[in-house]
Protein backbone atom coordinates (compact mmCIF):
# COMPACT_ATOMS: atom_id res chain seq x y z
CA UNK A 1 0.00 0.00 0.00
CA UNK A 2 1.46 3.36 -0.93
CA UNK A 3 2.16 5.73 1.91
CA UNK A 4 2.30 9.47 1.79
CA UNK A 5 4.81 11.37 3.83
CA UNK A 6 3.64 14.80 4.91
CA UNK A 7 6.61 17.16 4.94
CA UNK A 8 7.07 19.05 8.17
CA UNK A 9 8.40 22.48 7.39
CA UNK A 10 10.00 25.02 9.72
CA UNK A 11 6.66 26.62 10.54
CA UNK A 12 5.43 23.33 12.04
CA UNK A 13 8.35 23.14 14.45
CA UNK A 14 8.17 26.83 15.32
CA UNK A 15 4.47 26.68 16.17
CA UNK A 16 5.00 23.38 17.98
CA UNK A 17 7.62 24.98 20.20
CA UNK A 18 5.39 28.00 20.81
CA UNK A 19 2.50 25.72 21.84
CA UNK A 20 4.77 23.69 24.13
CA UNK A 21 6.04 26.83 25.83
CA UNK A 22 2.50 28.18 26.22
CA UNK A 23 1.27 24.93 27.79
CA UNK A 24 4.33 24.84 30.05
CA UNK A 25 3.64 28.34 31.32
CA UNK A 26 -0.03 27.45 31.84
CA UNK A 27 0.55 24.38 34.01
CA UNK A 28 3.68 25.57 35.85
CA UNK A 29 1.76 27.46 38.58
CA UNK A 30 -0.38 24.37 39.20
CA UNK A 31 2.70 22.15 39.51
CA UNK A 32 4.33 24.68 41.84
CA UNK A 33 1.36 25.24 44.14
CA UNK A 34 -0.23 21.78 44.01
CA UNK A 35 1.82 20.15 46.82
CA UNK A 36 1.44 23.26 48.96
CA UNK A 37 -2.35 23.32 48.61
CA UNK A 38 -2.69 19.57 49.23
CA UNK A 39 -0.75 20.02 52.46
CA UNK A 40 -3.25 22.59 53.68
CA UNK A 41 -0.91 25.51 52.90
CA UNK A 42 1.50 24.23 55.52
CA UNK A 43 4.52 22.33 54.25
CA UNK A 44 7.96 21.63 55.63
CA UNK A 45 10.18 24.65 55.17
CA UNK A 46 13.70 23.85 54.11
CA UNK A 47 16.23 25.14 56.62
CA UNK A 48 19.89 25.46 55.83
CA UNK A 49 21.62 27.55 58.46
CA UNK A 50 24.66 29.28 57.01
CA UNK A 51 27.50 30.35 59.33
CA UNK A 52 27.75 34.09 60.00
CA UNK A 53 29.74 36.10 57.47
CA UNK A 54 31.27 39.07 59.24
CA UNK A 55 28.19 40.76 60.77
CA UNK A 56 25.76 39.19 58.31
CA UNK A 57 23.65 36.32 59.72
CA UNK A 58 24.95 37.14 63.20
CA UNK A 59 22.28 36.59 65.90
CA UNK A 60 21.94 39.59 68.19
CA UNK A 61 19.44 39.38 71.08
CA UNK A 62 19.75 43.16 71.56
CA UNK A 63 19.16 43.98 67.91
CA UNK A 64 16.55 46.71 67.53
CA UNK A 65 15.56 45.83 63.95
CA UNK A 66 15.75 42.91 61.54
CA UNK A 67 16.87 43.52 57.95
CA UNK A 68 16.12 40.80 55.39
CA UNK A 69 17.82 41.01 51.99
CA UNK A 70 16.11 39.32 49.02
CA UNK A 71 18.36 38.78 46.02
CA UNK A 72 17.75 39.23 42.29
CA UNK A 73 16.55 36.60 39.82
CA UNK A 74 19.97 35.04 39.22
CA UNK A 75 20.05 33.22 42.54
CA UNK A 76 19.62 29.42 42.84
CA UNK A 77 19.81 29.00 46.61
CA UNK A 78 20.53 30.82 49.84
CA UNK A 79 24.23 30.14 49.24
CA UNK A 80 24.77 31.73 45.84
CA UNK A 81 25.10 35.45 46.41
CA UNK A 82 27.04 37.39 43.79
CA UNK A 83 30.16 39.26 44.86
CA UNK A 84 28.38 42.56 44.36
CA UNK A 85 25.48 41.50 46.58
CA UNK A 86 27.88 40.24 49.23
CA UNK A 87 29.68 43.56 49.03
CA UNK A 88 26.61 45.66 49.77
CA UNK A 89 25.55 43.32 52.56
CA UNK A 90 28.88 43.72 54.32
CA UNK A 91 28.61 47.49 53.98
CA UNK A 92 25.08 47.52 55.38
CA UNK A 93 26.21 45.36 58.30
CA UNK A 94 28.90 47.89 59.15
CA UNK A 95 26.60 50.91 58.77
CA UNK A 96 23.67 49.32 60.67
CA UNK A 97 25.56 47.52 63.43
CA UNK A 98 22.60 47.40 65.83
CA UNK A 99 20.35 45.59 63.34
CA UNK A 100 20.25 41.85 62.60
CA UNK A 101 21.08 41.49 58.89
CA UNK A 102 19.92 38.29 57.15
CA UNK A 103 20.32 37.10 53.58
CA UNK A 104 19.74 33.32 53.59
CA UNK A 105 16.17 33.19 52.29
CA UNK A 106 15.72 31.87 48.75
CA UNK A 107 12.98 34.20 47.57
CA UNK A 108 11.94 32.13 44.56
CA UNK A 109 10.71 29.04 46.38
CA UNK A 110 7.50 28.63 48.33
CA UNK A 111 9.29 26.43 50.89
CA UNK A 112 12.84 27.88 50.71
CA UNK A 113 14.10 24.79 48.85
CA UNK A 114 17.18 25.60 46.74
CA UNK A 115 17.30 24.68 43.07
CA UNK A 116 20.62 22.86 43.30
CA UNK A 117 19.74 20.28 45.97
CA UNK A 118 16.87 18.06 47.14
CA UNK A 119 15.08 18.35 43.79
CA UNK A 120 14.61 15.97 40.87
CA UNK A 121 15.92 18.62 38.49
CA UNK A 122 18.83 19.66 40.72
CA UNK A 123 21.47 18.25 38.29
CA UNK A 124 20.05 20.43 35.51
CA UNK A 125 20.12 23.57 37.68
CA UNK A 126 23.68 22.84 38.81
CA UNK A 127 24.65 22.50 35.15
CA UNK A 128 22.88 25.77 34.31
CA UNK A 129 24.71 27.53 37.14
CA UNK A 130 28.07 26.27 35.87
CA UNK A 131 27.24 27.55 32.39
CA UNK A 132 26.21 30.92 33.74
CA UNK A 133 29.50 31.37 35.57
CA UNK A 134 31.53 30.77 32.41
CA UNK A 135 32.76 33.79 30.49
CA UNK A 136 31.91 32.49 27.02
CA UNK A 137 28.75 34.06 25.63
CA UNK A 138 26.96 30.90 24.49
CA UNK A 139 27.59 29.22 27.85
CA UNK A 140 26.38 32.14 29.95
CA UNK A 141 23.26 32.48 27.75
CA UNK A 142 22.28 28.90 28.65
CA UNK A 143 22.69 29.80 32.30
CA UNK A 144 19.88 32.32 32.01
CA UNK A 145 17.46 29.42 32.27
CA UNK A 146 17.77 30.15 36.01
CA UNK A 147 16.59 33.72 35.48
CA UNK A 148 13.66 32.53 33.38
CA UNK A 149 12.59 30.02 36.01
CA UNK A 150 12.71 32.65 38.78
CA UNK A 151 10.84 35.15 36.62
CA UNK A 152 8.02 32.60 36.36
CA UNK A 153 7.77 32.66 40.16
CA UNK A 154 7.59 36.44 40.08
CA UNK A 155 4.71 36.21 37.62
CA UNK A 156 2.92 33.70 39.86
CA UNK A 157 3.32 36.08 42.80
CA UNK A 158 1.81 38.90 40.73
CA UNK A 159 -1.03 36.85 39.21
CA UNK A 160 -4.29 37.40 41.11
CA UNK A 161 -5.30 33.75 40.47
CA UNK A 162 -2.36 32.34 42.43
CA UNK A 163 -0.99 35.29 44.41
CA UNK A 164 -2.89 34.68 47.65
CA UNK A 165 -1.58 31.12 48.02
CA UNK A 166 1.95 31.73 46.77
CA UNK A 167 2.56 34.91 48.74
CA UNK A 168 1.22 33.38 51.92
CA UNK A 169 3.76 30.57 51.56
CA UNK A 170 6.56 33.11 51.12
CA UNK A 171 5.41 34.93 54.26
CA UNK A 172 5.58 31.64 56.19
CA UNK A 173 9.14 31.13 54.98
CA UNK A 174 10.13 34.63 56.11
CA UNK A 175 8.59 34.35 59.58
CA UNK A 176 10.08 30.89 60.12
CA UNK A 177 13.46 32.26 59.11
CA UNK A 178 13.20 35.27 61.41
CA UNK A 179 12.37 33.09 64.40
CA UNK A 180 15.53 31.07 63.82
CA UNK A 181 17.47 34.26 64.59
CA UNK A 182 15.49 35.14 67.71
CA UNK A 183 12.68 37.26 66.28
CA UNK A 184 9.73 37.28 68.68
CA UNK A 185 6.41 37.33 66.83
CA UNK A 186 4.62 38.24 70.07
CA UNK A 187 6.75 41.36 70.52
CA UNK A 188 7.70 42.23 66.95
CA UNK A 189 10.54 44.55 66.13
CA UNK A 190 10.72 46.55 62.89
CA UNK A 191 11.23 44.29 59.89
CA UNK A 192 12.98 45.94 56.95
CA UNK A 193 12.85 43.98 53.69
CA UNK A 194 15.54 45.07 51.25
CA UNK A 195 14.75 43.75 47.76
CA UNK A 196 16.82 43.88 44.62
CA UNK A 197 15.36 43.73 41.11
CA UNK A 198 12.76 40.96 40.67
CA UNK A 199 12.66 40.12 44.37
CA UNK A 200 10.59 43.26 44.86
CA UNK A 201 7.45 41.42 43.77
CA UNK A 202 8.12 38.59 46.24
CA UNK A 203 8.49 41.16 49.02
CA UNK A 204 5.40 43.10 47.94
CA UNK A 205 3.33 39.91 47.88
CA UNK A 206 4.51 38.72 51.29
CA UNK A 207 3.93 42.08 53.00
CA UNK A 208 0.16 41.65 53.05
CA UNK A 209 0.37 38.39 55.03
CA UNK A 210 3.22 39.56 57.26
CA UNK A 211 1.10 42.55 58.27
CA UNK A 212 -2.41 41.04 58.37
CA UNK A 213 -1.66 37.55 59.66
CA UNK A 214 1.38 38.16 61.86
CA UNK A 215 0.88 41.87 62.68
CA UNK A 216 4.49 42.75 61.92
CA UNK A 217 5.66 46.33 61.32
CA UNK A 218 7.10 45.95 57.81
CA UNK A 219 9.14 48.52 55.91
CA UNK A 220 10.22 47.86 52.34
CA UNK A 221 13.29 49.15 50.50
CA UNK A 222 13.08 48.53 46.76
CA UNK A 223 16.36 48.74 44.84
CA UNK A 224 15.28 49.08 41.19
CA UNK A 225 12.50 46.55 41.79
CA UNK A 226 9.68 45.26 39.62
CA UNK A 227 6.44 44.79 41.54
CA UNK A 228 2.71 45.39 41.45
CA UNK A 229 1.02 47.65 43.97
CA UNK A 230 -1.33 44.92 45.22
CA UNK A 231 -0.48 44.04 48.83
CA UNK A 232 2.24 46.65 49.21
CA UNK A 233 -0.28 49.02 50.82
CA UNK A 234 0.09 46.95 54.02
CA UNK A 235 3.68 48.14 54.42
CA UNK A 236 4.31 50.95 56.89
CA UNK A 237 6.38 52.74 54.23
CA UNK A 238 8.00 51.95 50.88
CA UNK A 239 11.24 53.47 49.59
CA UNK A 240 12.29 53.18 45.95
CA UNK A 241 15.93 53.63 44.96
CA UNK A 242 16.08 54.39 41.23
CA UNK A 243 18.94 55.42 38.94
CA UNK A 244 18.35 57.86 36.08
CA UNK A 245 19.91 55.48 33.52
CA UNK A 246 18.13 52.31 34.67
CA UNK A 247 16.24 51.44 31.47
CA UNK A 248 15.38 47.89 32.63
CA UNK A 249 13.35 49.31 35.51
CA UNK A 250 11.45 51.69 33.25
CA UNK A 251 10.70 48.96 30.72
CA UNK A 252 9.24 46.61 33.33
CA UNK A 253 7.23 49.44 34.87
CA UNK A 254 5.17 49.47 31.66
CA UNK A 255 3.77 46.05 32.63
CA UNK A 256 2.61 47.17 36.07
CA UNK A 257 -0.39 49.48 35.50
CA UNK A 258 -1.30 49.36 39.21
CA UNK A 259 1.77 51.54 39.84
CA UNK A 260 1.08 54.15 37.22
CA UNK A 261 0.32 57.53 38.72
CA UNK A 262 -2.01 58.59 35.90
CA UNK A 263 -5.21 56.61 36.73
CA UNK A 264 -7.28 58.40 39.35
CA UNK A 265 -7.92 55.20 41.31
CA UNK A 266 -4.37 53.86 41.13
CA UNK A 267 -3.40 52.24 44.44
CA UNK A 268 0.17 53.44 44.06
CA UNK A 269 -1.08 56.98 43.50
CA UNK A 270 -3.14 56.82 46.70
CA UNK A 271 -0.15 55.56 48.67
CA UNK A 272 2.03 58.31 47.23
CA UNK A 273 -0.57 60.96 48.02
CA UNK A 274 -0.74 59.67 51.60
CA UNK A 275 3.03 60.09 51.98
CA UNK A 276 3.69 56.37 52.36
CA UNK A 277 6.11 56.07 49.45
CA UNK A 278 9.44 57.80 48.96
CA UNK A 279 11.51 57.83 45.80
CA UNK A 280 15.26 58.31 46.17
CA UNK A 281 17.23 59.39 43.10
CA UNK A 282 20.47 57.41 42.88
CA UNK A 283 21.96 59.47 40.06
CA UNK A 284 23.36 58.02 36.84
CA UNK A 285 23.23 54.36 37.87
CA UNK A 286 22.19 51.44 35.67
CA UNK A 287 20.33 48.30 36.67
CA UNK A 288 23.28 45.92 36.89
CA UNK A 289 26.83 45.30 35.73
CA UNK A 290 29.32 48.10 35.11
CA UNK A 291 27.75 51.38 36.10
CA UNK A 292 25.11 49.57 38.18
CA UNK A 293 23.99 50.19 41.73
CA UNK A 294 26.43 47.61 43.12
CA UNK A 295 29.44 48.50 40.98
CA UNK A 296 32.54 49.29 43.01
CA UNK A 297 34.53 50.67 40.06
CA UNK A 298 32.16 53.41 38.88
CA UNK A 299 32.02 56.51 41.08
CA UNK A 300 29.63 59.40 41.73
CA UNK A 301 30.61 63.01 40.91
CA UNK A 302 31.82 63.24 44.52
CA UNK A 303 34.17 60.29 43.94
CA UNK A 304 32.18 57.73 45.97
CA UNK A 305 31.95 54.20 44.49
CA UNK A 306 28.41 53.38 43.39
CA UNK A 307 28.13 50.44 45.79
CA UNK A 308 29.14 52.64 48.74
CA UNK A 309 26.66 55.34 47.74
CA UNK A 310 23.87 52.74 47.47
CA UNK A 311 24.73 51.19 50.82
CA UNK A 312 24.87 54.59 52.53
CA UNK A 313 21.50 55.65 51.11
CA UNK A 314 19.89 52.43 52.34
CA UNK A 315 21.62 52.57 55.72
CA UNK A 316 20.34 56.11 56.26
CA UNK A 317 16.78 54.88 55.79
CA UNK A 318 17.26 51.79 57.99
CA UNK A 319 18.80 53.80 60.82
CA UNK A 320 16.00 56.36 60.55
CA UNK A 321 13.46 53.55 60.93
CA UNK A 322 15.29 52.28 64.02
CA UNK A 323 15.37 55.74 65.61
CA UNK A 324 11.73 56.52 64.80
CA UNK A 325 10.47 53.24 66.26
CA UNK A 326 12.56 53.64 69.43
CA UNK A 327 11.45 57.20 70.15
CA UNK A 328 7.89 56.42 71.33
CA UNK A 329 9.23 53.81 73.78
CA UNK A 330 11.71 56.27 75.26
CA UNK A 331 9.04 58.92 75.62
Label for each model-derived stretch:
Residues 221-228, 243-247:
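Active-site nucleophile loop of the alpha/beta-hydrolase fold
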Residues 234-329:
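Lipolytic serine-hydrolase domain surface
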Residues 194-199, 203:
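Gly/Ala-rich beta-loop-alpha elbow adjacent to hydrolase catalytic centers
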Residues 17-20, 27, 33-47, 68-187, ...:
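Active-site catalytic motif of lipid deacylating hydrolases and related acyltransferases
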Residues 1-65:
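Intrinsically disordered, low-complexity regulatory segments
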Residues 208-216, 232-241:
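Short, surface-exposed basic-aromatic patches at helix termini and helix-loop junctions that form
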Residues 63-65, 99, 187-190, 216, ...:
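Short coil/turn segments at beta-strand junctions that form active-site/ligand-binding loops
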